[in-house]
Amino acid sequence: MLKFKYSDFIKAIFLLFISIGVFIISAGLFYEESYHYKKDDYFTHYALTLDEVKDIPVISDNYEFYYYSPDGTQRLTNGVVFYNPMPEHKAELVKYIETLGFKKTKSIPWSYGNINEVWIKGHDEVNLVQDDKNRTINISFIKQ
């Protein structure tokens, strides 16, 4: 006669609950189409931040990362907004962009009162925006 083992049943139920939990957590991670996060949010920082963004020189003590997922025609965008940086530190970001192999294609000084620079490498793009009015420097990497 067939013997039913309670321990095998409990193991199967436990494994089922663990699997459902992992699925819900991983699905929830990518549910949002945009994230704003700090470096100390380790899981989000590790999972969503591009290597180019992880290695950006820090030019201010106050900064936050952002991520926009590719959806439809929107491309993956990941970057950093630096609040109250010293304007002369922008040169560090320019040097970093150049070391990655990006070439400056245009500078738009009239873009809503900001200084907007666009850098291209292949199909990838970097936007560097200096907003003197709000005292921010925004660098974003846009991937194809």
Regions found by a protein language model. Name each.
Residues 46, 86-89, 134:
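Residues that cap or initiate secondary-structure elements
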Residues 56-109:
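Mature extracytoplasmic domains of secretory-pathway proteins
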Residues 10, 57, 73, 80, ...:
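Intrinsic disorder/low-complexity detector
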Residues 2-5, 86, 131:
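Alpha-helix initiation/capping motif
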Residues 98, 102-144:
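Non-cytosolic head/periplasmic domains of membrane-anchored proteins
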Residues 2-75:
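N-terminal leader/targeting segments
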Residues 38, 51-56, 91, 110-113, ...:
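N-terminal start-of-chain detector that recognizes signal peptides
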